[in-house]
Amino acid sequence: MAIRYPMAVGLNKGHRVTKNVTKPRHCRRRGRLTKHTKFVRDMIREVCGFAPYERRAMELLKVSKDKRALKFIKKRIGTHIRAKRKREELSNVLAAMRKAAAKKD
C-alpha cells in the first residue's frame, strides 16, 4: 500500500516507500488468444464453415429472436456463459456479412 502521509498513527502510518511494480504472472495469460491460434481457427472456419446448430442459430438471429437463439445454443453447448459468447460471435459474423453485402452493392 502506498503511504500518503508520513504519520505515526492511522491508516496512512509508516515510512514512505515506492511500491515495486511486478510483472503479471504467466498463469494470468490463460485463455488469451495467440496470433497462431487465431490464424488456425480462422483457417478452419474458412474451410469447414459453420456447424448445423450454428446455422440454425444464425437464422434465429436474422429474425431478431435473440433470446430463443441463446436458449437453443445453451441447449447444444451446455453452459450459459459459453452460449452468450457463441451468440455474440455469430451476431458479429452476421453483421460482417451484412457489411460486406452493403459494400458490394
Swiss-Prot record:
The keyword Cytoplasm applies. It comes from the Eukaryota. One of its GO terms (molecular function) is structural constituent of ribosome. One of its GO terms (biological process) is translation. Keywords: Cytoplasm, Ribonucleoprotein, Ribosomal protein. Pfam families: Ribosomal_L36e. The keyword Kinase does not apply. It is found in: Cytoplasm, Cytosol; Cytoplasm. GO terms for cellular component: cytosol; ribonucleoprotein complex; ribosome. Belongs to the eukaryotic ribosomal protein eL36 family. Component of the large ribosomal subunit. Component of the large ribosomal subunit. The ribosome is a large ribonucleoprotein complex responsible for the synthesis of proteins in the cell. This is Large ribosomal subunit protein eL36. It comes from Xenopus tropicalis (Western clawed frog). The gene is rpl36.
